[in-house]
Every structure is written in structure tokens, then in C-alpha cells.
Amino acid sequence: LTLEGAEVLGVYEAKPTPSGLTRNIHQCLHDYDIPLHLSHTVTRVFGADRLTGVEVAEVDAHMRPITGTEQRIDCDALIVSVGLIPENELAESLGVPLDGHTRGPVCDGQLMTEIPGIFSCGNALHVNDLVDYVSASGELAGRSAAHFAAHTRDEVAVTISNDFGYLVPQRLDRTQDNSAVTLYFRSAEVLGPCRVVLTIDGSEVWSRRYPFLRPPEMQQLTLDFDKLGIADASDVHFEIEVAKA
């Protein structure tokens, strides 16, 4: 909008932390001196034939407007951003179980859903930050569908701690090549220095340190589960350990 000549008066985010990617905040807001107001929301709009202004107010920890903080801003346009959720009408019509966190199908490392022969990929599986991830998952789903026709399956579940917003895939098929399984995850909240830990049957087998984790920024990692030694009915579990102050 700024590049097209509009004057953007501000961005109002109801959450106490930004929902956008860090790079987008810097490139789209900071670089153009557009203010970001956290813990604020639009509570009223003004105008008859067209918009003449809006009312904004601070919100509390429960996203409820705080009385007495209202202010009117004169403007002629309001853009409301409500985020994204995967579109899965087709999957639901086929009875494919969905993950309550991703809003997409529960899948294994080859992106097959819990209904044999049905695969999911891209933003139908979970909302991706980059189109590169969408393309990669589409290629994997295609290869996996071709492999599925001639093989049986032996699956184990992948579980996560409450510090995760979600992690994909949710299952691993031991009959497949699991030497380079790509996993995607988001934290449930903003975290400082922390460690993502993988345990198999209660023993730590892998970990990675992160300076911080933010829910808007999806993380990607690739692991060799073949070398990590997943047995029949293994307990495969990821958790996040936050560094103590």
C-alpha cells in the first residue's frame, strides 16, 4: 500500500507479540516507519456510504477491550487480516482424521493420512511459510503415493510436549526410507533460549539448540530415523527444554 502511494497509519495486533514473520515486520513495517501497536484491536467503524474512521482500543490478556483506552483514528480504508487455515473439505468428506493443532490431516513421514492411500501436502496439510516447503511436500507425497501401491506398512506414532504448537509428521512408517525425514514445527508460544529434544523409548538420541522460537515462524529440520533405531512400538517423543534464567 505504501509503495502505491497510500499512507498507512498503523498495524494493530491483538496479541502481545507479533503474529507476522520477523523479516516481514522489518521489511514491511520498520523500513517504512509504519507503527505496530501490540495488544490493540479495532472495536468500531465509522461512516455511512464509505469508511471515515475506526475506533481502536487496548485489549487485556483475554483479548477483551479495556474500557477507557479507546481512541478514534480518521481513515478511509481498513484491512482486516484473519490468518490462514488449511482447506480440507475434500479430506473431511472422505473421513480423513484432522489434527486439531494444524487443522490439516494427521500424516506419517511420507505424508500419507490415516486412511491408506490418501496423501496430503502443501497448505492443505499445514500452513507453510515458504512456497519451497509446499513444493517439496508435493514431490514427497507424489513419490510416496507411487511407493504405497506395492508395500505394507509398520507405523509408530510421533508425540510432542505441550510447548509445541504442532509438529508434522505425526507418524513414521518403518517400512519406508526414513534416512532423511523432514519435520516442520511451531512453538506454542514465544520462547527464549531453548533446546528441542528427541527421545526414543525414554532415551535422548538427538537435540538442537535455538536462540528463540516464535509461533509465526515455522521451523524445519531433517533427521535420519533409520540410524536412530526405531523399533516396533517405539515411543518417539519430542519436547522443548527452556533454558533456566
Which sequence ranges carry the predicted segments?
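A Rossmann-like FAD-binding core segment of flavoenzymes
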Residues: 2-89, 179-212
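FAD-site-proximal beta/loop scaffold in flavoenzymes
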Residues: 77-128
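Exposed aromatic-hydrophobic patches
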Residues: 184, 216-228
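A conserved FAD-binding loop/helix module that cradles the flavin
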Residues: 121-169, 242-244
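Conserved mixed alpha/beta catalytic, RNA-binding, or beta-rich assembly cores of soluble enzyme
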Residues: 98-100, 137, 152, 196, ...
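A short alpha-helix-loop-beta-strand transition element characteristic
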Residues: 5-10, 97-100, 153
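Surface beta-strand/loop "capping" patches
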Residues: 153-191
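Short, aromatic- and glycine-rich surface loops/edge beta-strands on solvent-exposed regions
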Residues: 196-198, 226-245
